Amino acid sequence: MDLAHLQDVIERTYGERDRERGVPSTVAWLAEEVGELAQAVRKGDHAQRVHEFADVLAWVASLANQVGVDLGEAVQRYARGCPRCAAVPCSCP
């Protein structure tokens, strides 16, 4: 699934509810999911990690939808490698 499709699915599935919840609460939910991902990385098995990565991506897509950010456009920042030094691999100090 590409990022545009993810954003579309999240919008159609949760968009109305997400807008009612609002940006501050969505950020809080995203932070909670990042915490769950961190725990799964430390202590979980592969299936738990996949689950938590999916949840984080869904909340990122929700937040992006609410604030009008196209994630496909956003990731272009990394299209040529490191956004600071433009090298692959990064050669930043």
Predicted regions and their residues:
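Flexible "arm" and connector segments at domain edges
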Residues: 1-53, 57-93
